[in-house]
C-alpha cells in the first residue's frame, strides 16, 4: 500500500489524537470511532495514519535489562494497519561499528519479515532467544534478545583504501647520486660515479614506472641501464602490471630462486594488492568480551594492566593491536557501573608472520611473458650464452591459524620449477621455516631454519642449513652451508652482567668456516650519560689458507646532546691497534651528524701497512638533497673519498617542488606562499614535518591514507593565521602528488603611537586594518594584529575621508614596537574632535 502524505488538517487531528495514547479512558468515555490495539485506544486520526503506514525506530534490548538507557538503535521498521491487524511490512538494518550485533539466524529472520502480524501483546516471536516488541505509547520497536541471540562485533582484518584523492596527472622523481674516488699509494687515482633515477607518473590509480641508472658520468666510460618500464594498476584488491618487469614486480608471493639475471617483458595479474590493507597486528585467536550494558574491559597479564577499552552492550572483540607479541594468557575483566561483572582467562596469539596475516583470503598471481637471459658464468668453469625464452607461472600463499605457506610454479627455457615456503610457530618459543625448490633438470634446493627462545626468556638459539644441487640447465650454483648461533642474556641472572652472543658458520662447498663471539655490558647509565663495554673475537678460515683471528675490546661513552665517544683496541693481521671514535648529532640545521675515527698500531709487525689510519664523515640533510660525505685513509695507504646524495621531485600541473627526503613515490606539494624563511608545520598522521618558504614537497609512502593538518611551528617566532586549507584528507597511490594551497596570513602584533600630520595624538580613535580593528587609548597608543601582506592602518573620519599609516614590517617577526607613526591624510586630530563626530570604519 503506498504511503500518502499527511494533509495539514490530518496532522492536526493526529497530534490531538496522540494525547489519547497516554491516557487509558474507561469504556464509557471511549470514542465510538476509536479502535483498541494491544490495550491502547487508537483515535481515528492515528488509525488512519497507521493504515497509510509509518516508519518507527528499531532498538536492540537485552532481555532482563532494566530501562532503555543501554538500548542501541540498529535500524527502522515500516508498520501498517491492515483490516484491524497491525503488521510489519519490512525492516531496514543500519550497520555501525559501535552497535551490538545479532546472530546470523536472528538477522535472517529480521530480513525475511514481510507483512508479519503482531499478536495481541504486540509481539512477533523470531527465535527461541529473540522477539520483536512494539510500544505504541512510545512509537518504537524493540528487538528483545537473550545473550545467545547476540552476534560478535569482530574487528576488520582488511580494508580497501578507496579511490585516489588526486584526479589529475602528477609525477614523483626520486634520484640517488654517488661519486667515489680512490687515491693510490703510488699517486694514481680512479674515480667513478652513478646517478639512479626512479620516476612514477600517475593518473588517479593508474601509473607508469621508469627505473634506470647512468654510470661513469663525465668519464670516457659512460654507460646507462634501464631496469624497469611498466604500467601498473593496483585497485580494490587486485593488481595488474605489464611491461619490462623485475622478478618482484612479476610476483611477490612465493619464492622464485631459480630465475637467472636478465630482463622480463610480461604481464602479471592477481589479488596480491597493496590497495587492500590487512591488519596482522590483532591476535589470531580473537579475545571476546560480553557486556550486559555499556562498560569497560580490562586486560591484565601477570598482575600488570595491559589495556582498558570501552564498549557498548553486546559481544565485542577486544582490540589487541597494542599488546605484546607472543602466545600468552590474559585475564579479561568486564566492569559495568564500577562493578566487576565477569572475569575469565583467554589466550592471546600474536606472532610475527609473513604475508597478509591470519584469516586473510587465499592470495594468488598469474604471470608470464618473454625472458631475455643474460650470459652466465660460474667461476669461469661453466658458462652459458645469452638466450631468449618464454616464461609463465603462478604463485599463491595462505595461512591456517598460525601456519603460513607460499608456493610458486613456473617454467622457462623448457624447464619446470616448483618452489614452496612453509612457516610454522610451535607454541610461543619455537619457529620453523622451510623453503624448497625442485626442477625438471633434477635441480633441488632445501633451506631450513629453526629459532627458539629457551625457558626463562634469557636466551635464544637459531640454526640454519642450506643444500642446493643444480642440474645441467638452471643457471645457478650449488650450495652447502650451515650456521648456528645464540644469545645469552646474563643480565637476567645477575644485574651486573651483560649479553653474550656466539655464532658459527660452515661453508662446506668452499671449505671455509668462521665463528664469532661478542660480549656487551652496560657499565653505567645515569644523568651524565651511559658507558658500555664491548669485547669480541672472530676467527676465519678460507680453504687451505691459515686461520685469521681478530680480537677487540672497547668502551663506548654516550653523552647528552647527541655526543658519543669510543676507545678500544683490536688485534688482527699480527699486530695490535688502539682505536678512537667520536660522533656528534644535531637536531637542526643542514649538518645532522659529524664523526671521526683514528687508529694507530701500538705493537706487532705491521708489514706494508701504515701505522696510522683514520677518517671523518658528515651526514647532511639539505632542502633538496640528503646524504653522506666520507673521507677515509686505510691501513693499506689508500685514501677513499665518497659522496652520496638523494632526494625527490614532485610535480602536478604548474606546481613543482623538490625535497631531500625519499620516503616514498607519492607525496604532497605545500604551496604556502610564505616569504623568506617563514616556517609552519604539517602534522601528517601524528608526525610533525617542518615547512619552510613558499613551496615544499613532502614524499610519502603510496597506498596510504593521510590526515594532514597545517599549524604554527613551535620553532618559529612568526605567527600565522591559516584561514583555509588547514585540514585535508588524502588517499595516495604511486605517483600521486597532491597540492595543498592554504590561505596563510603572517601575523605581526604591532604596537605604537599614532599621530596626525601636525603631531597631535589620535586619542580614543577607532583604527582599522585588513583583518580587524581596535581603539587607541587617551595617549594615542594601540596594539593590533597586522597581516604582513597588508601592512597598513587606516582611520576614517568626516564621512568618507580617510588617513592611512604605512608600516615597515619586512623584518618584523612576532611582535614589534613601531613607535610614533603618522596617519597621512589627517592634518590635525583637533579638527576631528572639535566637530564632535563619532569616528568609525
UniProtKB/Swiss-Prot annotation:
Disruption phenotype: Mutants do not express ECP and are defective in biofilm formation. Pfam families: CooC_C, TcfC. Residues 1-29 form the signal peptide. InterPro entries: CarboxyPept-like_regulatory, Pilus_assem_C, Pilus_assem_E-set-like_dom. The keyword Transport applies. Transmembrane segments: none annotated. Induction: Negatively regulated by H-NS. Positively regulated by IHF and EcpR. Keywords: Fimbrium biogenesis, Signal, Transport. It comes from the Bacteria. Part of the ecpRABCDE operon, which encodes the E.coli common pilus (ECP). ECP is found in both commensal and pathogenic strains and plays a dual role in early-stage biofilm development and host cell recognition. Belongs to the EcpC/MatD family. This is Probable outer membrane usher protein EcpC. It comes from Escherichia coli O18:K1:H7 (strain IHE3034 / ExPEC). The gene is ecpC.
Amino acid at each position: 500500500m503506498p504511503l500518502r502524505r499527511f494533509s495539514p488538517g490530518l496532522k492536526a487531528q493526529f497530534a490531538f489524537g496522540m494525547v489519547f495514547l497516554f491516557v487509558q479512558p474507561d469504556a464509557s468515555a471511549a470514542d465510538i470511532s476509536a479502535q483498541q490495539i494491544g490495550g491502547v485506544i487508537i483515535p481515528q486520526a492515528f488509525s488512519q495514519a497507521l493504515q497509510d503506514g509509518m516508519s518507527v525506530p528499531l532498538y536492540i534490548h537485552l532481555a532482563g535489562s532494566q530501562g532503555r538507557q543501554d538500548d542501541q538503535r540498529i535500524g527502522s521498521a515500516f508498520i501498517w494497519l491492515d483490516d484491524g491487524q497491525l503488521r510489519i511490512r519490512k525492516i531496514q538494518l543500519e550497520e555501525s561499528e559501535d552497535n551490538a550485533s545479532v546472530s546470523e539466524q536472528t538477522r535472517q529472520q529480521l530480513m525475511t519479515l514481510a507483512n508479519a502480524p503482531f499478536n495481541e501483546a504486540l509481539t512477533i516471536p523470531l527465535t527461541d532467544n529473540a522477539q520483536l516488541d512494539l510500544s505504541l505509547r512510545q512509537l518504537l520497536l524493540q528487538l528483545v534478545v537473550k545473550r545467545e541471540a547476540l552476534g560478535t562485533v569482530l574487528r576488520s582484518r582488511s580494508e580497501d583504501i578507496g579511490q585516489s584523492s588526486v584526479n589529475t596527472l602528477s609525477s614523483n622523481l626520486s634520484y640517488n647520486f654517488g661519486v667515489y674516488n680512490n687515491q693510490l699509494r703510488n699517486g694514481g687515482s680512479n674515480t667513478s660515479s652513478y646517478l639512479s633515477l626512479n620516476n612514477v607518473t600517475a593518473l588517479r590509480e593508474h601509473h607508469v614506472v621508469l627505473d634506470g641508472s647512468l654510470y661513469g658520468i663525465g668519464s670516457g666510460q659512460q654507460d646507462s641501464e634501464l631496469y624497469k618500464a611498466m604500467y601498473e594498476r593496483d585497485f580494490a584488491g587486485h593488481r595488474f602490471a605489464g611491461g619490462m618487469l623485475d622478478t618482484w614486480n612479476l610476483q611477490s608471493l612465493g619464492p622464485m630462486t631459480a630465475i637467472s639475471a636478465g630482463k622480463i617483458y610480461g604481464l602479471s595479474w592477481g589479488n596480491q594488492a597493496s590497495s587492500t590493507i590487512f591488519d596482522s597486528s590483532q591476535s589470531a585467536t580473537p579475545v571476546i568480551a560480553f557486556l550486559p550494558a555499556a562498560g569497560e574491559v580490562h586486560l591484565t597479564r601477570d598482575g600488570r594492566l595491559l589495556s582498558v577499552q570501552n564498549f557498548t552492550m553486546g559481544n565485542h572483540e577486544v582490540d589487541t593491536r597494542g599488546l605484546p607479541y607472543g602466545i600468552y594468557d590474559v585475564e579479561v575483566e568486564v566492569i559495568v557501573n564500577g562493578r566487576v561483572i565477569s572475569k575469565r582467562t583467554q589466550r592471546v596469539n600474536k606472532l610475527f608472520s609473513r604475508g597478509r596475516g591470519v584469516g586473510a583470503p587465499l592470495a594468488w598471481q598469474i604471470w608470464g611473458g618473454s625472458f631475455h637471459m643474460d650470459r652466465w658464468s660460474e667461476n669461469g668453469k661453466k658458462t652459458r650464452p645469452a638466450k631468449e625464452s618464454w616464461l609463465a607461472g603462478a604463485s599463491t600463499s595462505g595461512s591456517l591459524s598460525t601456519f603460513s605457506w607460499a608456493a610458486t610454479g613456473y617454467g622457462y627455457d623448457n624447464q619446470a620449477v616448483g618452489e614452496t615456503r612453509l612457516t610454522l610457530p610451535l607454541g610461543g618459543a619455537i619457529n620453523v621455516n622451510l623453503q624448497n625448490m625442485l626442477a625438471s633438470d633434477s635441480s633441488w634446493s632445501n633451506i631450513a631454519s629453526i629459532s627458539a627462545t629457551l625457558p626463562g626468556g634469557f636466551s635464544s638459539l637459531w640454526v640454519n642449513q642450506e643444500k642446493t644441487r643444480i642440474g645441467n640447465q638452471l643457471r645457478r650454483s650449488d650450495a652447502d652451508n650451515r650456521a648456528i648461533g645464540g644469545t645469552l642474556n646474563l643480565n637476567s641472572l645477575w644485574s651486573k652482567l651483560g649479553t653474550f652472543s656466539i655464532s658459527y658458520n660452515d661453508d662446506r662447498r668452499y671449505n671455509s668456516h668462521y665463528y664469532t663471539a661478542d660480549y656487551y655490558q652496560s657499565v653505567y647509565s645515569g644523568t651524565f650519560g651511559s658507558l658500555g663495554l664491548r669485547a669480541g673475537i672472530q676467527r676465519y678460515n678460507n680453504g687451505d689458507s691459515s686461520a685469521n683471528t681478530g680480537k677487540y675490546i672497547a668502551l663506548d661513552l654516550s653523552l647528552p646532546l647527541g655526543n658519543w665517544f669510543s676507545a678500544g683496541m683490536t688485534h688482527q693481521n699480527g699486530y695490535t691497534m688502539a682505536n678512537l671514535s667520536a660522533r656528534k648529532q644535531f637536531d637542526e640545521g643542514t649538518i645532522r651528524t659529524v664523526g671521526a675515527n683514528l687508529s694507530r698500531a701500538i705493537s706487532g709487525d705491521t708489514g706494508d701497512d701504515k701505522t696510522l689510519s683514520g677518517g671523518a664523515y658528515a651526514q647532511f640533510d639539505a632542502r633538496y638533497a640528503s646524504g653522506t660525505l666520507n673521507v677515509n685513509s686505510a691501513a693499506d695507504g689508500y685514501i677513499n673519498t665518497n659522496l652520496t646524495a638523494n632526494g625527490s621531485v614532485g610535480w602536478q600541473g604548474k606546481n613543482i617542488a623538490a625535497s631531500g627526503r625519499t620516503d616514498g613515490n607519492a607525496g604532497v606539494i605545500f604551496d604556502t606562499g610564505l616569504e623568506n624563511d617563514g616556517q609552519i608545520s604539517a602534522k601528517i598522521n601524528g608526525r610533525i614535518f617542518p615547512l619552510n618558504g613558499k613551496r615544499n614537497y613532502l614524499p610519502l609512502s603510496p597506498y596510504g591514507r593521510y590526515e594532514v593538518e597545517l599549524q604554527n611551528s613551535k620553532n618559529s617566532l612568526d605567527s600565522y593565521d591559516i584561514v583555509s586549507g588547514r585540514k585535508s584528507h588524502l588517499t595516495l597511490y604511486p605517483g600521486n602528488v597532491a597540492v595543498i594551497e592554504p590561505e596563510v596570513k603572517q601575523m605581526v602584533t604591532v604596537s605604537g603611537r599614532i599621530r596626525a600630520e601636525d603631531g597631535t595624538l589620535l586619542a580614543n580613535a577607532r583604527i582599522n586594518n585588513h583583518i580587524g580593528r581596535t581603539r587607541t587609548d587617551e595617549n594615542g597608543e594601540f596594539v593590533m594584529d597586522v597581516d604582513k601582506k597588508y601592512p597598513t592602518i587606516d582611520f576614517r573620519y568626516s564621512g568618507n575621508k580617510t588617513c592611512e599609516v604605512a608600516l615597515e614590517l619586512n623584518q618584523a617577526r612576532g611582535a614589534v614596537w613601531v613607535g610614533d607613526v603618522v596617519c597621512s591624510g589627517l592634518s590635525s586630530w583637533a579638527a576631528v574632535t572639535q566637530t564632535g563626530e563619532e569616528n568609525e570604519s
